[in-house]
UniProtKB/Swiss-Prot annotation:
The keyword Protease is annotated on this UniProt entry: yes
Peptidase S1 domain residues: 105-337
Designated name of the protein: Serine protease 56
Gene source species: Homo sapiens
Pfam families cross-referenced by the UniProt entry: Trypsin
InterPro entries per the UniProt record, alphabetical: Peptidase_S1_PA, Peptidase_S1_PA_chymotrypsin, Peptidase_S1A, Trypsin_dom, TRYPSIN_HIS, TRYPSIN_SER
Enzyme class, UniProt record, top EC level: hydrolase
Organism lineage string: Eukaryota, Metazoa, Chordata, Craniata, Vertebrata
Length: 603
């Protein structure tokens, strides 16, 4: 082990100096890798900060819209029977390919704007992951596997269909996620989930729902049905920039069994496509629609399948697999029916303003917690109110925890594919908490192929803060204060010009006499960002595997140090600021490893 350290790092010529433990610096090549990863972490931090601000700005926009419409904001759960946005299943005609098997979505053809008014896009922290289908004014149907590892509704938004004239699509927060209770992520059995929108779709807007089947069976085999989505153009390829569409024939159960083997569960799955290959859904299309036309004076589209999984994309003999919607009709109707027996969502509780909320509204919101209360009505109401407050506090912590985990995950994800890091640490592993929470699984899951990947990251453009008086709109002013607080807290990263958004590690000085049981050494770190310099203590590995393991924490410490330095920028600290991390913080100006040996600076 000592030999590996000597080979990796140039050590001083003597082991001891004046009785003090020996120090060693990471070589310039390692500092370059650290700097590159630090810059990527800064970019991820800036995007995460912008997303947090966008989320609150979006809440303000929707709160203002609700106040203008009804004079008072109401959580979505208190809205009863919102009007449906027009007749279901009606769409503009298009030229989707019906007979030839050369198209893909994976290929297909570009759909004209507004051709699929029920097609929506689900985004996690601004990153598009799955498709979905609007089935009612407040409900979207999608695949349950989209939410494996990411069940927090506060992190999701839904982008509605754009208009036929190319109007900008509306982005709506998610209020509730209801995966089917019997969904099995190993077999994709019952791969279905309902998503409740925070605000219902406007009746006059471009989005309208698809029709749900009235009978528990699908059209006969051979029926040409439509698929649409933004998914990959080929397996492991880039996602489509615009909606693409194609038509695929329904296949018989026997044909599907022969093609797909025991992985197919006919009770809840159907398959569609050409056995010759070529036309199929792909990664990113998960949760999207498989619709078939219902003949009549006014033809309409009926949703018979939700994109679930496949063996590759458009490969010969491997049709796509869809969750059968018809067999879940009763469950869908039950979940979409307004009911006070459902526990309030985190978004409803976070929008609730206990000091200002009307008593009747609070009672309706918290009624779930009074269901099994054996006491008097007054005592049960007080108990329900207290439980509402307790869950609200848990939701606040949950939101904060997911935001912090997301920041750490973004920094970690940027470490793996870098050539310099592969040279130093070929086996970088995510910490267990981040791994368990990671939502970046393949969308339109390729169960039989391990090389699939999710679509690229995209973040929503910053929305302007809606203007208007808060009078008569309770809860709007606290949201504006929260927005101002977020803007202030993240100003340190948002105000850094893009040309200066680069982290430079100047020195990492490790104490060879401080090795821990995990193989890490205590180190003194100096780094710079846009003319601002910080110094802090941390733990670093000197071998490839331990160095890789210590990088995520080191980068998070650097981000925290730059934030603290920015907040204290007006204090007379000089060009360097000591921001010790973790236990045993040292006084400013003192070397954390040896008070008598100041850290040498590189030229």
């Amino acid at each position: 082990m000592l030999l590996a350290v000597l080979l990796l790092l140039p050590l001083p010529s003597s082991w001891f100096a004046h009785g003090h433990p020996l120090y060693t610096r990471l070589p310039p090549s390692a500092l370059q890798v650290l700097s590159a990863q630090g810059t990527q972490a800064l970019q991820a931090a800036q995007r995460s900060a912008q997303w947090a601000i966008n989320r609150v700005a979006m809440e303000i926009q929707h709160r203002s819209h609700e106040c203008r419409g009804s004079g008072r904001p109401r959580p979505q759960a208190l809205l009863q029977d919102p009007p449906e946005p027009g007749p279901c299943g009606e769409r503009r005609p298009s030229t989707a390919n019906v007979t030839r098997a050369h198209g893909r979505i994976v290929g297909g053809s570009a759909a004209p704007p507004g051709a699929w008014p029920w097609l929506v896009r689900l985004q996690l922290g601004g990153q598009p992951l799955c498709g979905g289908v609007l089935v009612a004014a407040s409900w979207v149907l999608t695949a349950a596997h989209c939410f494996v590892g990411a069940p927090n509704e506060l992190l999701w938004t839904v982008t509605l269909a754009e208009g036929s004239r190319g109007e900008q699509a509306e982005e709506v927060p998610v209020n509730r996620i209801l995966p089917h209770p019997k969904f099995d992520p190993r077999t994709f059995h019952n791969d279905l989930a309902l998503v409740q929108l925070w605000t219902p779709v406007s009746p006059g807007g471009s989005a309208r729902p698809v029709c749900l089947p009235q009978e528990p069976q699908e059209p006969p085999a051979g029926t040409a049905c439509a698929i649409a989505g933004w998914g990959a153009l080929f397996e492991d390829g880039p996602e489509a920039e615009a909606v693409r569409e194609a038509r695929v024939p329904l296949l018989s159960t026997d044909t599907c069994r022969r093609a797909l083997g025991p992985g197919l569960r006919p009770s809840t799955m159907l398959c569609a496509g050409y056995l010759a290959g070529g036309v199929d859904s792909c990664q990113g299309d998960s949760g999207g629609p498989l619709t078939c036309s219902e003949p009549g004076p006014r033809p309409r589209e009926v949703l018979f399948g939700v994109t679930s999984w496949g063996d590759g994309c458009g490969e010969p003999g491997k049709p796509g697999v869809y969750t059968r919607v018809a067999v879940f009709k009763d469950w869908l109707q039950e979940q979409m029916s307004a009911s006070s027996s459902r526990e309030p969502s985190c978004r409803e509780l976070l929008a609730w303003d206990p000091p200002q909320e009307l008593q009747a509204d609070a009672a309706r919101l918290c009624a779930f917690y009074a269901r099994l209360c054996p006491g008097s009505q007054g005592a049960c109401a007080r108990l329900a109110h207290q439980q509402c407050l307790q869950r609200r506090r848990r939701c606040e912590l949950r939101s904060l925890a997911h935001t912090l985990l997301g920041l750490l995950r973004n920094a970690q994800e940027l470490l793996g594919p870098r050539p310099g890091l592969r040279r130093l640490a070929p086996a970088l592993a995510l910490p267990a908490p981040a791994l368990r929470e990671s939502p970046l699984h393949p969308a339109r899951e390729l169960r039989l192929h391990s090389g699939s990947r999710a679509a690229g990251t995209r973040f929503p453009k910053r929305r302007p803060e809606p203007r208007g008086e808060a009078n008569g709109c309770p809860g709007l002013e606290p949201l504006r204060q929260k927005l101002a607080a977020l803007q202030g807290a993240h100003a340190w990263i948002l105000q850094v010009p893009s040309e200066h958004l680069a982290m430079n590690f100047h020195e990492v000085l490790a104490d060879l006499g401080s090795k821990t049981l995990t193989g890490l050494f205590r180190a003194w770190v100096r780094a710079g960002l846009g003319g601002r310099h910080v110094a802090f203590s941390g733990l670093v590995g000197l071998e490839p595997a331990t160095l890789a393991r210590s990088l995520p924490r080191l980068l998070v410490q650097a981000l925290q140090a730059f934030r603290v330095a920015a907040l204290a920028e007006g204090e007379p600290e000089g060009p360097w600021m000591d921001v010790g991390q973790g236990p045993g913080l040292e006084r400013k100006g003192h070397h954390p490893l040896n008070p008598q040996v100041p850290p040498a600076r590189q030229p």
